[in-house]
Curated annotation (Swiss-Prot):
BP term (GO), one: translation
Gene of this entry: rpsN
Quaternary context: Part of the 30S ribosomal subunit. Contacts proteins S3 and S10.
Protein name, per record: Small ribosomal subunit protein uS14
Function as written in the Swiss-Prot or TrEMBL entry: Binds 16S rRNA, required for the assembly of 30S particles and may also be responsible for determining the conformation of the 16S rRNA at the A site.
Native species: Marinobacter nauticus (strain ATCC 700491 / DSM 11845 / VT8)
Length: 101
């Protein structure tokens, strides 16, 4: 189990990413536009750097919804490999069966 503070920190990051997504996309569009003047591009880069660090989507981490485990998380189920196996064996995940060939 991950510490509660780590789970809360991740939720805080998700909120910040959602809050600043439009602003970040707008600034990146200005920077990538080849018709933008150098001064405008420089201003956009400075504004982008002034945004909160945790508002960057690359700082997000996929975590297990049950335990908060950061490694071995399957995106489709949002569960760690351990919990997915446990739930699969109990029959809680529809369509998931143990392999046999």
């Amino acid at each position: 189990m991950a510490k509660v503070s780590m789970k809360n920190r991740e939720q805080k990051r998700e909120k910040l990413v959602a809050k600043y997504a439009a602003k970040r996309a707008e600034l990146k569009a200005i920077i990538k536009n080849p018709n933008t003047s150098d001064d405008d591009r420089w201003d956009a880069q400075m504004k982008l750097q002034q945004l909160p660090r945790d508002s960057s989507p690359s700082r997000l981490r996929n975590r297990c919804q049950v335990t908060g485990r950061p490694h071995g998380v399957l995106r489709k189920f949002e569960l760690s490999r351990i919990k997915l196996r446990e739930y699969g064996m109990r029959g809680d995940v529809p369509g998931l069966t143990k392999a046999s060939w």
